[in-house]
C-alpha cells in the first residue's frame, strides 16, 4: 500500500507558489500576444509554408487566419483556452500556451479553410515549428 501524502504548511506554500507562478507566466504570455500579433502571425505562416507543413493557395490568407486566431486568444477566458487546447495538452512536457493554442487552431480549424489545401506532419512537428516562432517574437 502506498504512502499517503499529507503536505505540511511549508510544502503547501511551495506548491502554491509554483502553481501561481505557472498561472502568472500563462497570463503574461497571453497578454504579450497583443503586442506582437502581426509579426508573429507572419512568422508562423511563413514557417509553416516553408517547412511544407501547410499547403495553401494563399500565404496571405493563412497569415490573416493566424492573426485572427491570435486576436481571439487575447480575448478568451481561461476556460475557453483550456477547452481548445485540451486534446493537445500532453503533446510536449511543458507546453507554451500560445504555441499550443495556435497548434490546436491549425490542426482543428485551419484544415477546413478554403485556401488550405492540406496539412502535413505530426502534431508535434507543427507545435515545434510554431513554438520556434513564438519564442522568437515573444521571449519570456
Where are the predicted features?
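Internal, charge-rich low-complexity segments
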Residues: 2-140
Amino acid at each position: 500500500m502506498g504512502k499517503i501524502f499529507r503536505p505540511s504548511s511549508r510544502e503547501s506554500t511551495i506548491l502554491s507558489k509554483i502553481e501561481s507562478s505557472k498561472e502568472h507566466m500563462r497570463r503574461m504570455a497571453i497578454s504579450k500576444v497583443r503586442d506582437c500579433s502581426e509579426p508573429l502571425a507572419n512568422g508562423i505562416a511563413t514557417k509553416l509554408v516553408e517547412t511544407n507543413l501547410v499547403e495553401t493557395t494563399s500565404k496571405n490568407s493563412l497569415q490573416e487566419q493566424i492573426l485572427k486566431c491570435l486576436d481571439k486568444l487575447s480575448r478568451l477566458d481561461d476556460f475557453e483556452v483550456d477547452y481548445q487546447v485540451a486534446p493537445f495538452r500532453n503533446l510536449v512536457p511543458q507546453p507554451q500556451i500560445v504555441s499550443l493554442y495556435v497548434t490546436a487552431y491549425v490542426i482543428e480549424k485551419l484544415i477546413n479553410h478554403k485556401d488550405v489545401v492540406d496539412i502535413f506532419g505530426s502534431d508535434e512537428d507543427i507545435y515545434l515549428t510554431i513554438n520556434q516562432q513564438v519564442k522568437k517574437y515573444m521571449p519570456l
